[in-house]
């Protein structure tokens, strides 16, 4: 009864809910029918006699009520069934259901008499509804539908839908019956005894765990020190298989079997077109030269009175043809360099491509394999076995410890304790603890075995050391070979593309050159006819005088030489273009030293985009345009027998052509330069002889035509030469005729000056620049600068003239503002303005051929002015001998200076010591013999006569004395060898590489190993000296500050720069992926600030490897790498500390304001109280100390990894005054904070670990901090003030949105201006725009403290002093690899007084070796007594410098040793080329006299 009543009431609730929710009528009817069923069951229970007797009187009332509910809910069910019939348009059924519902409701109303009013109201409401529905349905059916009304029992009965179910009840459930009152019937004494037994078990466990932990700690430390990974100890199997990446390349080539064939065919076609173009250009040149020669002969025949033949139109057309020819020649020369490099690259890669497309067995054979003896393999196996034992011991120990813990945990003897007497408890404990004895024995045996295992491991590791070294070297070779093969595969497509571009380019050029050749032929024929006509007319007038003949002495020999060289070529070189086979373009030191080939933008039209580095090669020559009469000595110059060496040619124009922005070589050589074997004269002639047949070219600066304009900025390789051992230049083996002068005539006036055309044909008239020196005086020239050289400005020297009045001279050009030159600079000339302080003097005047004065060159990075007064006085006359001294220091890869090898055997010659430019006054007749380099090979521009000082006539009485030099003939070398070397260089011969010496050729031995040549990655550059000690630097900084101030001064410029940066960011971001960061959206604070996949920080030991942090590198050589990250979220603090631990970070910079900390916008991820460490995952962070300054809070934290006893300290620097939406209070605070950060960074070792920087999102304030940090370091290092937008773009290429606000950029600009002003004030220079007047004491008090105050005055923190000292550091010369970095320590300010340098005191060096020595001698050390030494820097000028000199980075025994490289571990581990007992002895080293091997590794 109760169950059914309750179920019916529950079903009623569901019925009411369904009706309120307007469920379907059929569903409501079924629910209502189920209510009827439940109440019918209850009614049956009420009719049960037992129940009736139990209830008594109320049984009738209950039954009546239940029956009323049955009828009522049946009426509801039939009402909704009627609605259902209405929806189905069964109108007869609708009337039947409504009739039934009305009947049942009437029954319910009868049974409801005596019920409360609420029930009566409900029934009345139901009657209204059902009655209304019934009447409406009946009328509709009667009058409209006329459907038959079926009987109710013929309709489908309504089945109930039970939606409720009864839940069973457990009578003993504690929730029903309450807690069990009999649960605690164990006696209290038994509980106490059980507790005592538990303590005994815990004591036993603690004792064993302590022993295990001690042994584990010893084992971990031992294994960490061994650095032996069992997985990688024996990975010899990896070398027996071809790596997957190489297999992919082999598979790709196997489906293209014609790869190499197509490449070779394409290059052969290109060579053919190249040869055709060169032949056509040569034909045009020969036509023009022949025409000019005939013209000269005609004028000599007819005299000056005879007018030139032919109409002026023909001459103008010929001039136009000549210009077109010069233009096409220049384009051809520029393209020929790319063509040569393309062939070199093809020859380099074609072997690798053949290998990759061949059988896999050959590929596998080409990879290095381990060469291990059986003994080595036995050592390996032994080590592996012992390492396996160590691992087995560990596993067993862990297993036994786990068993012990589980056994103790499960041991419960309460049942025994209840039945045991209290006096017997101890005895019971002892018996029960005996069950652990077996496990204790096993554990102690395991611990005891550790010492034996470690002893055996130590012995095995000692034997493994040699094998380990062999395997590591093998791994390096394996990776290197792999990279070379993959690079060759990747270069193939680019080679084919460039080859096709070259063919298209040369096809276009060929058509134009062919048209020009036809035009030149027709014009020359017309000219010849006109000349013949004029000659015939003149011959009729008078008898013709005998025509002078001008033989062409060496032209045929040159052609024979070319043919002979071509026959000498090896088979693989015969497809090279002719200019590569025509003999060496430069002396062999040039081979393999040019800049690496970058194809784009090259001379081929349409070539864009960067391309692969290819093998660097020699500088190609200018097209041969020398005269037919080769360097004939003038009568004014005395001749004497004995060969003379010519200087190696420099590929710069002698005609005043302005070089392009980055010319590789293609400037047309002077038509007046001698070509071929030299004439045996004492000195070069003072001016070109008149017999030259070269045309008087007036070259324009690159006429703008379609063909030339397609040659966009050519490859930047002009004079970018890398020093290194290289073979000596080949010398010709044929004898040279020795003409003997008939007489020594008096000095003659200089010939008529040639006219040069520079730029827009402003003719500079006057004699060729010559330099005259008194007789017998060793001529002093400035030493070649070591390091990047500023190119010479137009500063011609005044020339002596025989006439009383001076002729017009070229005016000095105004010096352009210094601009940074990405291209390597041309080399410095021997004459012209020179800085007065020479850091490294040499006695190699013949090794440094000069440029001609008057050649426009790109503006230098640092301007300088000549110092005519310094060292202008000639030293005492002394005839000293010249010997090849030690070669110059190795140069940085981008240096413009050219070290040449010493030529052959030493020759005694008069000294040409380098010094400042000499006084140009001629003091009388003179003939100073000059030692110059051997003959340039054919088809190569030879040096102009004024490349090396030559004896020149000057007015004065008496004959010109001559002193013939005793020169040894150079050793004969096969000239073809140089051409064969074109492809002999290796991938190391790119920038910074070394070239192995050739057999039997002298070895260049650098006195320093350039850091760029080392394979290791460069660390942070230190600033070891104050770069602003020189006034020139401060003056340059002032000028830069003036222009920098206005860059972002107004809002318009700032908006424009910001717009460009935003557009560049969108462009750069399209090519970079952030797919990994998107997978970890919960770890990103902002969904638009995520790291790029390419440079994100990868966690190595976390649950996953992701953290929102990016590596930001390459902002400045002096700025450490940074990790920009967001502030840690509550769930990523463990990742943050794990990154700090894995990256070995020592400095964390936090740029979050105090307000953000107080509002708890930033989760505290570091402890703030001592003794309260925070645990993040496996790492524990504790606070060691806190120091609060005016600008920041400095916390020293200790980081400890779980289960390790070693702790690591790091510094947490918090800058609290930078609000989230704003700027710091002043730039000064941030600048001081940056100095503090850098000082802390310099304290760590090593210096290549990053600094972690974070703000809120890791891009806004973090970006501004990184930008200003890098810019400040650039200024402190003495580099130019950096371009902030470029730095911003570089940062954003590594992390999007770095420097989020435009205001941040403006703030950084203002802060950098402020910092530069402080640097200037620190050195006593007022910033630009401020008065220079002496400041009063009150004014001085407002300036920043000077260096003395920083050390001695005030309460300056020690970190500030250390930061200042750190700013005085600089990497030594050998470590520099960029011009900008090395210039600060090399360029001398122009304003030094003349007394700052000692006068040169030439002294004779030691006597020479016998001149007949057939082999090259090693360079002689200490042969530089006649060269002025650079003045020492003197003692430190202030306490700050004294303190700076005592830092570990800058300490040395003598202040003059500053700038020398510190000794490090690498100095003892790396071999040094060219060092040994022959190295120069440092005279300023007080310990150098103790042991001759003292300086073996000293750099």
Curated annotation (Swiss-Prot):
UniProt catalytic activity: O-phospho-L-tyrosyl-[protein] + H2O = L-tyrosyl-[protein] + phosphate
Function per UniProt: Plays a role in sorting of endocytic ubiquitinated cargos into multivesicular bodies (MVBs) via its interaction with the ESCRT-I complex (endosomal sorting complex required for transport I), and possibly also other ESCRT complexes. May act as a negative regulator of Ras-mediated mitogenic activity. Plays a role in ciliogenesis.
Subunit description: Interacts with GRAP2 and GRB2. Interacts with UBAP1 and CHMP4B.
Residues with Omega-N-methylarginine modification: 785, 1478
Organism whose genome encodes this protein: Rattus norvegicus (Rat)
Molecular function as annotated in GO: protein kinase binding; protein tyrosine phosphatase activity
Keywords: Cell projection, Cilium, Cilium biogenesis/degradation, Coiled coil, Cytoplasm, Cytoplasmic vesicle, Cytoskeleton, Endosome, Hydrolase, Methylation, Nucleus, Phosphoprotein, Protein phosphatase, Protein transport, Repeat, TPR repeat, Transport
SUPFAM superfamilies from the UniProt entry: (Phosphotyrosine protein) phosphatases II
PROSITE patterns on file: BRO1, TYR_PHOSPHATASE_1, TYR_PHOSPHATASE_2, TYR_PHOSPHATASE_PTP
Protein name: Tyrosine-protein phosphatase non-receptor type 23
Repeat (Sequence) residue spans along the chain: 788-789, 790-791, 792-793, 794-795, 796-797, 798-799, 800-801, 802-803, 804-805, 806-807, 808-809, 810-811, 812-813, 814-815, 816-817, 818-819, 820-821, 822-823, 824-825, 826-827
Sequence ranges of Low complexity compositional bias: 1427-1450, 1482-1499
Entry-annotated residues carrying Phosphoserine: 985-986
Region His, residue ranges: 598-993
Active site as annotated: 1255
Location(s) in or outside the cell: Nucleus; Cytoplasm; Cytoplasmic vesicle; Endosome
GO annotations of cellular component type: ciliary basal body; cytoplasm; early endosome; endosome; nucleus
Intervals holding TPR repeats: 75-108, 199-232
Any coiled-coil regions, as ranges: 278-305, 377-464, 506-537
Tissue note: Ubiquitously expressed, with highest levels in brain, testis and kidney, and lowest levels in skeletal muscle.
Encoding gene per record: Ptpn23
Disulfide bonds: none
Compositionally biased spans, kind Pro residues: 724-752, 785-827, 856-866, 900-909, 934-972, 1390-1419
Biased composition (Polar residues): 754-763, 1335-1348, 1464-1473
Family per record: Belongs to the protein-tyrosine phosphatase family. Non-receptor class subfamily.
Domain of life: Eukaryota
